[in-house]
């Protein structure tokens, strides 16, 4: 009974692990809390909104309180360095209030507009990152499943080839096979062993890619339920999707705002030619106590005025700033055009990828059936001497290659759907839930 205990514990733990496998929705929630890219984008957005208040502050009154207390003591000395009776001392207390209000300063208003545009841009960039993390998490998640599936098929192939190797050795021992058959089977088995090492490493690395996003090491993931999996064509044609992307794609929106900011920077540079008008006022109180003359006097000073500054010549700086801003506007406009073309390309490409994936899945499903039948026929032919061991090994490899390709095609379809929605700008958390519903739960995995 003691010898069976470790096995029983192991099986119990295995059952618990399967029941508590993390699904896509759980991994996504972990990523939302821990992904550095998303958190950085959120911080940038929050900072940009605070910058609006900072820019608005320059348009509001500036009031400062000043105060000071000074003691001055003068001692006269004779030539023999002895102090004389001529000692003077006075205490001075001052306090004041300064007030300044911009009446007209164009660059302050333009800076406020730019700050608001920057906030809109960062808000759009954050929304884009919220969509992007859905795709990044899904790519990493299904990257793990894809690596695991590949390793599973490699190990199944290793088992099949190992069985064929043993049978070939037995046939050789009784004189039914040549030694070359044994060598061919051994070579194939060794090749599969190498594939297994690579597959195990790919699984480990795929988990690391997922950990990079979530900040956690997830050991077990819910698998795709292939029995309930279905691939459907997009309900909208590619031209309509391109039109929708022009309105909803967040990268395109961010690029449009960047162009608006560049245009505002031209206005900011031109404001260097405009005058500025400022209202300044102040009050100064002074209380001086002179102990030498035993005098004490107080003063109250008031001032108010309007200051006008007209820029006449700044050494060509303003002209250069305007030209720089104009070139930057051209650059932003070209970036917008580049982004637009990229969005159109991506929408059409991902749309085509979905349709291609559907055809590929159907073809690979038939390929698996055909490869299985071919292997059975080849093995039967080998038994009666009409086929060689090389034919059997090739048929075995084709069967498991077809299984791997079918598995890859399913994952490629899922990711193509997400990529299309990201390109259009409609990717949302609901898509995560929809995909999550197609994963195996604890009940469906039994």
Residue positions per predicted region:
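Periplasmic alpha-helical coiled-coil/stalk elements that build and connect Gram-negative outer-membrane
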Residues: 2-3, 132-244, 353, 357, ...
